[in-house]
Structure formats: C-alpha cells, structure tokens
C-alpha cells in the first residue's frame, strides 16, 4: 500500500515531519502500540576527540557534530537509494544519502559537509 500525505498543514507539528512521527500519530489514532525505534547506545563514542566549533547565534541552543573518516565506499546501499527515490529524493553519495535517510526517518534536518 502506498500512502501519500501532504504535510504542509502540519508545520506547527515538527514531531510529525519524519516517518516515525507520522507512525506515532497513526498508532495513537488507531489505538495500537508503536514499535520503539531502534537506538544505538552512544556511550561508545563519548571518548572521541572534540571538534573545534563555535555557536555564534545565541538563539541556537544546540549544535551536534562528528567527523567520519576512512570512508572506503561512496555509494549508499541500493535499498537506501530506492527508499530515498520513493520519498522524492535523489541519491547523491553515501554521507549525503545517510543524512537524508535519517532526516526522513526522524524528522531531524541534518547535513554532511567536508571538514577540511
């Protein structure tokens, strides 16, 4: 089944911008349980070296970043590229596709850029 939702009227509900937010809303409307999102324990990354960055706008309350090194593959897996295509996005490269995939899943805008 393909379900197309025009989400333009829900701009005051950023929790609905991602697939998980929409699924949570449907689960509530249908009075059905929602499968929890698989979350990786991020404690394994707490000892990574800090990235030198500065938040210049006091209205920005948080900025998260990390570096990814030694990438040997530049193309996203086919299933990810297909899902992006069905969501109206074109595949670009592994890191850009990964951030777009996560944005669609969680509704959290992300961007990958070259640290150099």
Regions found by a protein language model. Name each.
Residues 1-116:
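RNA/tRNA-interacting regions in translation and RNA-turnover enzymes
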């Amino acid at each position: 089944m393909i379900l197309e939702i025009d989400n333009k009227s829900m701009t005051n509900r950023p929790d609905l911008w991602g697939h998980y937010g929409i699924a949570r809303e449907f689960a509530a409307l249908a009075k059905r349980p929602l499968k929890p999102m698989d979350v990786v324990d991020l404690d394994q990354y707490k000892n990574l070296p800090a990235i030198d960055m500065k938040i210049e706008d006091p209205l920005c309350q948080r900025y998260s970043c990390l570096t990814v090194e030694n990438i040997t593959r530049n193309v996203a897996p086919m299933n990810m590229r297909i899902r992006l295509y069905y969501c109206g996005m074109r595949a670009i490269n592994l890191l850009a596709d990964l951030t777009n995939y996560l944005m669609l899943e969680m509704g959290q805008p992300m961007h990958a850029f070259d640290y150099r």
